Amino acid sequence: MTTSFEELTDSYKCIFFDAFGVLKSSAGLYPGVLDRLRSLRERGKEIFLVTNDASKSPHRMVEAYSHPEAGPMFPLERIISSGLLASDYLKNKVRSGWVAYMGKDAASFYIADVGLHPVPIGQLNLDEHSPKALVLLDDEGFDWFDDLNRAVNLIRQHNIPVVVANSDIT
C-alpha cells in the first residue's frame, strides 16, 4: 500500500524540510516544490526550512530560497540554520572577545551578529587575538592545508570550544 504525500502530512501540524537536495539542487527547484509548499500552507500546516548551510546570513538564505515569480518560499522566522544554532551557543557561552572561524567571509555574520569579533583562521595572529572559540562555518573560504593545520594547532594549544556548524567539513 502506498501512502500519498497529502495522507502522510495530514498526521502532522508542522513539517520541516531539509534545504539542499530536498527542495532544490544546484540546477534549481525540483518540479512541484512550489505547489507542495502552497498546498501545505492552504491546509494550515506550519512549514520550516532546516539547513546545515552556515555560509550565508538568514536574510541571504531567504533570497536563496526565493522564486522569481512566487517570492520567498520561507519567511525569515521559518528558517533554522546551523549558523543560527552556532550564534546561540556563542551568545550564551562565549559572550565576548575574538572568535576564530573557518569559512567564507559572509559566514562571519553568525559571530558578529551576537557582538563577538570574528577573525578568519588564516588571519589569526595570537599576539593580536586571543580567540575564545573556533567555529567551523563552511567548507569553502579558507586554505585547506594551511588553515586546517592552524585550526588543529589552535585547539591543541588552547582549551577553547570548537563549534561545528557545518558538518560537511568534518
Where on the chain are the PLM-derived regions?
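HAD-like aspartate-dependent phosphatase fold
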Residues: M1-T170
